[in-house]
């Protein structure tokens, strides 16, 4: 890429650490590094969590199926992290119970029982209830299943608001001194004797040059592209891109249990209660080639998901019944596995020390992001005590078992605010909901009403604190209000951002 002459570039700060990529890995590293005394700059070419990190099945889980592939270390680490993350972010992470029906001809019951025994005991489970056997002929959540499914198991894992997990890590990093820049692309990286020189391009096209002693390449599906930019003389083909897609249906059943369905191809599909009125179903595992930006579910994937549901639920579904869908690409480390579903979900590092260090990250999962961040910083030589395992994320400074108590307190103090709306606010912001509602006594005090329980005060908070710059940032990532607001109501949010931009 042609370099701009120095006169056209604004020279900026000198950082200890430049992080390229605003997904969960980059966000977790930024948070951890700031408390270790490092000066940090994170750049993301779009919005935070705009790619893989907002396209997950939204689970903090041990990875039950990874036991089949003997990934015991990954499962153990994931189970330990599941408990830690639930403790530091109980507003956006909460327990779920999963029903695993036993289907004759697939995995035998003894194998499922053994796997779940290991799942209960590998990670020192404390906060979540244990596995139990269920008689699906009499259990309430067996009523929606096909008659052939008479027994199964019930076990625990956790839900997470995936994109909010990213945003809250970046918010905490910012409050500890990190420079978080969205809509900013690193378009060139030059290695000098003891420093990296990075050219950054903002959304308005303006260029800035920053210096960094270390660079972390956490660009997810674009990690090889960044490597090629930084080390153009070398060949970089470390990724296997695997596409995962989901469908969102109107509620398929009327209880709070999730289901894990085994398929004849040895894959699994989850059905999870979602956003009060919906059921989230996925995911797929499809080899992907091409540009990972802005991908959609394919007709074949939609049919695959529906077929999986129809094998287990009494009520058949079709792709046409879905109210929404989303797809993302998992940037997995290419380990030459024969199947996309058996490629390791563990993370791998590649570090180049021929001059100032460049650390590239491959793979990883939401559940292990915090541990990945610690390992990444240790790999770069930044040792220090582990602090992120106990320090709550913004809004998460209350016991994991006390969410309903917190909700009752807020409903008492702000009794005029709708009950479901209050639950949504507390599930998003936790104790920081106070920053939105403080000083208000009636809806009019919250400013313009956009529909549902969304008011201007919340939008302003998201702009001021959580890096939101567009309606999509708010409606699809910092919340899932796009599922609840009409097209007209969503247009009002877009108009608010447009007016704000014009006034700037």
Where are these regions (language model features)?
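Dinucleotide-binding Rossmann-like beta1-alpha1 core, especially the glycine-rich loop
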Residues: 58-142
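Short hydrophobic core segments
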Residues: 18-20, 210-220
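Glycine-rich Rossmann-fold phosphate-binding loop(s) that bind the pyrophosphate
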Residues: 22-23, 45
């Amino acid at each position: 890429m042609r370099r701009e002459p120095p006169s056209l570039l604004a020279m900026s700060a000198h950082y200890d650490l430049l992080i390229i990529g605003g997904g969960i890995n980059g966000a977790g590293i930024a948070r951890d590094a700031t408390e270790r005394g490092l000066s940090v700059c994170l750049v993301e070419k779009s919005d935070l969590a705009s790619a893989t990190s907002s396209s997950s099945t939204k689970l903090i889980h041990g990875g039950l199926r990874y036991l089949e592939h003997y990934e015991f270390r990954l499962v153990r680490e994931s189970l330990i992290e599941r408990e830690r993350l639930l403790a530091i972010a109980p507003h956006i992470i909460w327990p779920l119970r999963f029903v695993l029906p036993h289907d004759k001809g697939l995995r035998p019951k003894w194998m499922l029982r053994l796997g779940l025994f290991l799942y209960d005991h590998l990670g020192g489970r404390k906060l979540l209830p244990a596995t139990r056997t269920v008689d699906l002929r009499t259990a309430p959540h067996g009523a929606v299943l096909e008659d052939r499914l008479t027994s199964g198991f019930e076990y625990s894992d956790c839900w997470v608001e995936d994109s909010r997990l990213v945003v809250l890590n970046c918010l905490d990093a910012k409050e500890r001194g990190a420079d978080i820049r969205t809509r900013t692309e690193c378009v060139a990286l030059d290695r000098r004797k003891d420093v990296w020189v990075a050219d950054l391009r903002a959304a308005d096209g303006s260029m800035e040059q920053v210096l960094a002693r270390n660079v972390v390449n956490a660009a997810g599906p674009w990690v090889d592209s960044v490597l090629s930019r930084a080390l153009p003389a070398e060949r970089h083909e470390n990724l296997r891109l695997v596409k995962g897609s989901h469908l969102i249906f109107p509620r398929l059943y009327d209880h709070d249990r999730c289901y894990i369905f085994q398929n004849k191809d040895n894959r699994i599909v989850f059905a999870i209660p979602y956003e009060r009125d919906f059921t989230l179903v996925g995911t797929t595992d499809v080899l992907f080639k091409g540009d990972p930006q802005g991908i959609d579910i394919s007709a074949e994937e939609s049919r695959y998901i529906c077929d999986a549901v129809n094998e287990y639920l009494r009520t058949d579904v079709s792709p046409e019944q879905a109210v929404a869908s989303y797809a993302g690409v998992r940037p997995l480390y290419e380990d030459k596995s024969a199947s996309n579903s058996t490629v390791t979900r563990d993370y791998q590092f590649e570090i180049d020390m021929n001059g100032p260090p460049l650390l590239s990250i491959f793979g990883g999962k939401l559940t292990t992001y915090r541990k990945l961040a610690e390992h990444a910083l240790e790999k770069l030589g930044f040792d220090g005590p582990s602090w992120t395992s106990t320090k709550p994320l913004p809004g998460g400074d209350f016991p994991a078992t006390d969410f309903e108590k917190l909700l009752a307190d807020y409903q008492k103090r702000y009794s005029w605010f709708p009950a479901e709306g209050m639950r949504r606010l507390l599930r998003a912001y936790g104790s920081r909901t106070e920053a939105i509602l403080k000083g208000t006594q009636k809806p009019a005090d919250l400013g313009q009403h956009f529909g549902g329980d969304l008011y201007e005060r919340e939008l302003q908070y998201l702009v001021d604190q959580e890096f939101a710059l567009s309606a999509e940032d708010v409606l699809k990532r910092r919340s899932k209000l796009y599922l609840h607001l009409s097209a007209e109501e969503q247009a009002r949010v877009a108009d608010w951002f447009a007016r704000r931009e014009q006034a700037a």
